[in-house]
């Protein structure tokens, strides 16, 4: 069961460039021009968004354990959370935490105390979440003047494409292979202070691809670029990316990004299979959530 594609146009409001994050040492900057070259007046920017989600084949009935939200507030806000499936071993539904986390983020996005800051929004949404469980999260907020602010905990990801090339990508945060940083109901896990924060200058025509690890574990960068370049409609490209990821995840012979990383980290088939010429291959079965957003003039 695939969640139907949705499309929306995000309106604009009054610009603001302030970012007052409590952990500035973890903030990365990507600027394409010197401050003297930045024009004080420019067209306001917003997002045209397409979303598609496909649950894990064994989790279709409950809709999977990923969750997401998209808001039309200010230049546009979007986020993905991936519930950690290991909680099922303790008879806890892993989807509850991720869904409540996203519901809280959506509700609090225009809260005055959040100050349109991804760190504060992650913190307040996490604090308000009462379900047992844990989740990875990525959240992006667009300033109408073309500043994209990103907060990431774990291995959900975001890539920024311009003129057919990836010019920026978040990096996954992991304790070790296949064990990502995560927000949790347990006090020993990560918080917003452990998040990776980035500030990226975007321009009209840029395309943002955001998703859970079910996308990036199964789809290579060149496939993402090819699909987004050939299919400029965001609803269509999000659907195609999700379908390719889901297809690769079920292919036991596919040389997926996940399989390549696993082998690079020392994980492989038993020795007797290696003698027979076998190696670890295949995609990673998982929920797949894809958000594709095009930067447009308001």
Swiss-Prot record:
Recorded GO CC terms: chloroplast; chloroplast stroma
Residues at which Mn(2+) 1 binds: 82-83
Domain PPM-type phosphatase: 48-295
Tree of life domain: Eukaryota
Cofactor(s) essential for the protein: Mg(2+); Mn(2+)
Coiled-coil ranges per UniProt: none
Enzyme Commission number: 3.1.3.16
Enzyme class per UniProt: hydrolase
Cofactor descriptive note: Binds 2 magnesium or manganese ions per subunit.
Binding, Mn(2+) 2: 82, 213, 286
Keywords for this protein: Hydrolase, Magnesium, Manganese, Metal-binding, Protein phosphatase
Gene Ontology molecular function: any one: metal ion binding
Chemical reaction(s) catalysed: O-phospho-L-seryl-[protein] + H2O = L-seryl-[protein] + phosphate; O-phospho-L-threonyl-[protein] + H2O = L-threonyl-[protein] + phosphate
Name of the protein in its database record: Probable protein phosphatase 2C 26
The organism's taxonomic lineage, starting at the top: Eukaryota, Viridiplantae, Streptophyta, Embryophyta, Tracheophyta
């Amino acid at each position: 069961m695939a969640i139907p594609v949705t499309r929306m146009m995000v309106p604009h409001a009054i610009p603001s460039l302030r970012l007052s994050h409590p952990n500035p040492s973890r903030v990365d900057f990507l600027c394409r021009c010197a401050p003297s070259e930045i024009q004080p007046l420019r067209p306001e920017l917003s997002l045209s968004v397409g979303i598609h989600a496909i649950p894990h084949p064994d989790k279709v009935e409950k809709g999977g354990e990923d969750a997401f939200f998209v808001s039309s507030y200010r230049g546009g806000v979007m986020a993905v959370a991936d519930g950690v499936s290991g909680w099922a071993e303790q008879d806890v539904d892993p989807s509850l935490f991720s869904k409540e986390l996203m519901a809280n983020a959506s509700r609090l996005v225009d809260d005055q105390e959040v100050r349109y800051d991804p760190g504060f929004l992650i913190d307040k949404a996490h604090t308000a979440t009462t379900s047992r469980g844990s989740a990875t999260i990525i959240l992006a907020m667009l300033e109408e003047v073309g500043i994209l602010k990103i907060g990431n905990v774990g291995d959900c990801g975001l890539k920024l494409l311009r003129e057919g090339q990836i010019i920026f990508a978040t990096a996954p945060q992991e304790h070790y292979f296949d064990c990502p940083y995560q927000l949790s109901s347990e006090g020993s896990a990560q918080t917003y202070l452990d998040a990776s924060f980035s500030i990226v200058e975007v321009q009209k025509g840029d395309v943002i691809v955001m998703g859970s690890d079910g996308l990036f574990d199964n789809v290579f960068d060149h496939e993402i670029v090819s699909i987004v370049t050939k299919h400029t409609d965001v609803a269509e490209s999000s659907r195609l990316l999700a379908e390719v990821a889901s297809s690769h995840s079920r292919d036991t012979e596919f040389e997926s990004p996940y399989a390549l990383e696993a082998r690079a980290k020392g994980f492989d088939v038993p020795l007797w299979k290696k003698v027979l010429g076998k190696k670890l291959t295949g995609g990673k079965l998982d929920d797949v959530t894809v958000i594709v957003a095009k930067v447009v003039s308001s």
